[in-house]
Structures are given as structure tokens and as C-alpha cells.
Amino acid sequence: STPNGEEERIFLNIAEVGFGAEVVIRMNNVGRFAGSKLAYPLSLLSCLFSYRKRPVEVHWGNNKQSVPALTNLAVANGRFFGRGLQPAPQAQVDDGLFDILLIEGLSAIKIATRFPALKDGPPPGEPGMTEFQTQSILVTGPATVGVEADGETLGNLPASFSVLPNELFVVRP
């Protein structure tokens, strides 16, 4: 925990705020009843019809953006997650930066039609999708907006994410 008593968690790959976190929350609940193979598609389908976009504020560097209808925010250290999706195809785990994909205002139909495109990364210039890099980011908004990291439910907003450069030493053959 931090000096302020806040819980501190470490993630290696990708954290999400909004839609993706809701899918993970439901997947953890549905998986107990539907089995592991059906948990993800059932949770995704359920969220497509029930997820409500909410207003949030995103702070990074000297920037602040009000997002009136957050669909999803991915904080990516790695490139891939969720069965081959690439929210951040340029992400590098050793560059000291998060690659952020902010998706706002997309309806369930638009999410469903654009979801397959994330296999190759977000389409360039896609309306409602903003990409940027930062060392840290703070997301504030209603306490009902979920947060997940590496497939684990972390709780709800507010949430802050900071890169810990050169903290993990990996040996590969």
C-alpha cells in the first residue's frame, strides 16, 4: 500500500477501465457456472447489451481530458491481450511508457463491428479512438466504473497507473 493507505498493485501487460473491466468482472462470475471456454464469449455478449458509458476525466502529463461517454481505456505495457487482440500494436515493455487507447462514445453495435479490427490494432484515425503514450495516467469518475489489470478485477475508479522503469529483469533463452 502507498503512504496514503491506497492499495498498490503491479501489472505487466494491460489494464483497462470501463467496458473491458466489466467483461472481466462478468467472466469471473460466469466462469464458475458456464466453464472456462464459454465464460469470455458469454461475458462479452452480456456486456455488449448492458454496458453503460459513463463520464470520466483522464489526466496525463500536463494534459486533462473530459470524456463524456467512456467506452474503454486500455493502459498497455504489452501489445496483446484477450485472445489475440492488439489495443497497442506499437507497445514495448521496455520503453518506459504506457501506450494508451481511449475509446469513447461507441455504441454496442459499433463495439461489435470494430472488435474484430483490434486483432490488427486500432484502425488509424478511427473516430472515437485516441492513442497516446505516457509514463503515468490518472482516471477519475463514478465509483461504479470498473478497473482490471491482466485479467484480474482490481475494483473501481479512481485509478492511477505509473510505469516502474527498469524494475523487472527478464531472462530469455
Predicted regions span which residues?
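A generic local structural motif
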Residues: 43, 58-61, 85-87, 123-125
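Short, surface-exposed, charged loop/turn segments at secondary-structure junctions
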Residues: 29-31, 88-91
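Active-site/binding-pocket entry motifs
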Residues: 17-18, 29, 79-81, 106-108, ...
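ATP/nucleoside-binding phosphotransfer catalytic cores, i.e., glycine-rich phosphate-binding loops
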Residues: 60-67, 92-93, 98, 102-173
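Electropositive phosphate-/nucleotide-binding environments in soluble metabolic enzymes
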Residues: 17, 35-38, 91, 105, ...
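Short acidic/glycine-rich loop or secondary-structure boundary segments that cap or lie
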Residues: 20-23, 66-68, 81-84, 108-111
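Catalytic core of DAGKc-family lipid kinases
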Residues: 1-71
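Glycine-rich phosphate/pyrophosphate-binding beta-alpha loops
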Residues: 16, 20, 74-88, 153
